[in-house]
Amino acid sequence: MPLKLDDYKLSDWTDDSINPVYLGYVTIEGHWYIKKIDNSSRTMRYAAGLSEYTTNWGLKDKIDYFYIHEVL
């Protein structure tokens, strides 16, 4: 069953004047994904998990990011 991205709500974001920009989304169940927008390379990549959003948000600049179809 595909994920319903409408279930994810924007929770955190970084300053959009700094590259890259990170956007953190969470469901009420605690599932999450972080979108990394790199304006220099004009790319968007994603990291996702089922728990530990706060920890991963804190490590957002150190975790691995992938194409959306690889993580969601």
Residue ranges and their predicted role:
Residues 1-72:
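Viral virion structural and adsorption modules
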